[in-house]
Amino acid sequence: QDYCAQEGQQEVQRKDLSDLERYLRQSRQR
């Protein structure tokens, strides 16, 4: 169960990172 929870957290972190990168790229273009 802990392993599944860790995997889920990692996936969420990856999604947050991709969103953050997208946001940074947009702000850089301005």
Curated annotation (Swiss-Prot):
Tissues with expression: Extracted from castor bean.
Gene Ontology molecular functions: nutrient reservoir activity
Key words of the record: Disulfide bond, Seed storage protein, Storage protein
Annotated TM spans: none
Assembly notes: The mature protein is a heterodimer of a small and a large chain linked by 2 disulfide bonds.
Family: Belongs to the 2S seed storage albumins family.
Biological role: This is a 2S seed storage protein. Inhibits spore germination in R.solani and F.oxysporum. Exhibits anti-trypsin activity.
Protein name: 2S seed storage-like protein
Upper taxonomic lineage: Eukaryota, Viridiplantae, Streptophyta, Embryophyta, Tracheophyta
